Regions:
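Transmembrane alpha-helical segments in multi-pass inner-membrane proteins
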Residues: 275, 279, 286-350
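Single transmembrane alpha-helix segments in multi-pass membrane proteins
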Residues: 44-49, 62-119, 138, 154-160, ...
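Cytosolic-side transmembrane-helix boundaries in multi-pass membrane proteins
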Residues: 1-35, 248, 255-262, 331-376
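Membrane-interfacial amphipathic/re-entrant helices at transmembrane-helix boundaries
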Residues: 2-85
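Hydrophobic alpha-helical segments embedded in the membrane of multi-pass proteins
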Residues: 78-89, 104-107, 147, 169-172, ...
């Protein structure tokens, strides 16, 4: 191991020190500059493959801002990215790597749909009945997501199991169980592919401002409310203090009497509850039921980059999630309206994501290195 200290004068150390000390505006500027650089490189690649970079750029922005539908679909994607990003950020702030958000998302959405379909026959087919179904289904989805995340949390706290390994394994288990349920016990009647029946029309979020059936401002408002509540929890409560202290300086948390085991399980449970809520909103607002989980976008994995870009700050997750939502929508639109290969579009979008996320990832790693250096 190198004897270099955090205060050594090497080039890498100077860059790390600059990133760690960067203020909020500087970090935003770094992110914007990185994104613009990546986009420029991507456009050069597009031109080198014989396609028009001007067309690429025009269709990208047209897909995001060019119509009411484009804006609505961008906000729809952003809603899910924000919720999943907050779920990841909660765990990461506590120094816990919850890589299982996608599995918790799937189980939360599936549990929500199963609950609504099971209770629908016993409730009136009106607005009151619809909102009752939405609330009850969402509560069940949140609880299921939380319990599914509590399992690897308990394994880490009481059996010293690596949460990265256990959460990744639980992702595959969630996909497998979900596919089994949708191919058998809960497959919709008369439906060939693995999916549930559609939710009742009255058990849906109302259209507000936008007339796009798969998006409602109610879902976006839920995401913003979760962001604010999570921020207050982490910065203004004893529970949040215990979580953040455990993540930043484990030894300091231990000396101050923070119950490490309970904090780990509680943090994972909260993270999973938010992931379950994301799945519930996605199932109600976007799918109107539930489909083969293998075909669902990997929001839980992409949310890791969203959280890193936001420096694991719930407030920062909002612009980061909206960036990812816009890129997702713009990339899809380009694939539909041009002959540019989808692989090339995905590559350029991935390049932007990589360039934007890496500086923040490096900053977080450098900050931890400095903290460990101070402890020594």
């Amino acid at each position: 191991m190198s004897d270099a200290s955090p205060n050594s004068g090497g080039g890498i150390e100077r860059v790390a020190n600059r990133l760690v000390r960067a203020g909020g505006l500087e970090r935003v500027a770094i992110g914007v500059a990185s994104g613009m650089t990546a986009l420029l490189i991507g456009l050069v690649i597009v031109a080198a493959t014989g396609h028009s970079p001007v067309l690429f750029l025009r269709e990208m922005f047209s897909g995001i801002f060019g119509s009411e539908r484009g804006i609505a679909l961008s906000l729809r994607e952003s809603t899910v990215f924000i919720l999943c990003g907050v779920a990841v950020a909660v765990a990461f702030r506590a120094g816990i790597f919850n890589i299982g958000v996608h599995g918790q998302f799937v189980f939360g959405g599936l549990a929500t749909v199963m609950t609504i379909l099971a209770l629908a026959p016993s409730l009136p087919e009106n607005t009151i009945g619809g909102w009752t179904l939405i609330v009850l289904g969402t509560v069940v989805g949140v609880v299921v997501g939380g319990l599914y995340a509590a399992l690897p949390g308990a394994l880490k706290a009481y059996a010293d199991a690596n949460e990265i390994i256990t959460t990744i394994m639980l992702n595959f288990i969630a996909l497998g169980i979900g596919l089994y349920l949708l191919s058998g016990p809960f497959q919709g009647e008369g439906i060939q592919e693995p999916r549930t029946e559609s939710l009742p029309d009255y058990a849906a979020f109302p259209d507000l401002l936008f007339s796009i059936g798969s998006f409602s401002l109610v879902g976006f408002a839920i995401a913003l409310a979760v962001v604010l509540l999570t921020y207050v929890l982490l910065t203004r409560t004893r529970i949040g203090y215990d979580m953040v202290t455990s993540g930043k300086q484990e030894s300091a948390a231990r000396y101050s009497g923070v119950p490490a085991d309970r904090t780990i399980v509680g943090t994972m449970t909260l993270s999973g509850m938010i992931a379950g809520l994301a799945g519930a909103v996605f199932a109600i607002m976007v799918l109107g039921g539930f489909v083969d989980p293998r075909g669902i976008n990997t929001y839980g994995f992409d949310a890791i980059a969203v959280s890193l870009l936001a420096a694991n700050n719930p407030l920062g997750v909002v612009p980061a999630g909206m960036l990812f939502g816009g890129l997702e929508r713009g990339g899809s639109f380009i694939g539909i309206t041009t002959d540019i290969p989808s692989q090339l579009v995905d590559g350029v979008v991935g390049l932007v994501v990589l360039f934007v996320a890496v500086p923040e990832l490096f900053r977080v790693g450098a900050a931890r290195w400095y903290d460990h250096g101070d402890e020594k």
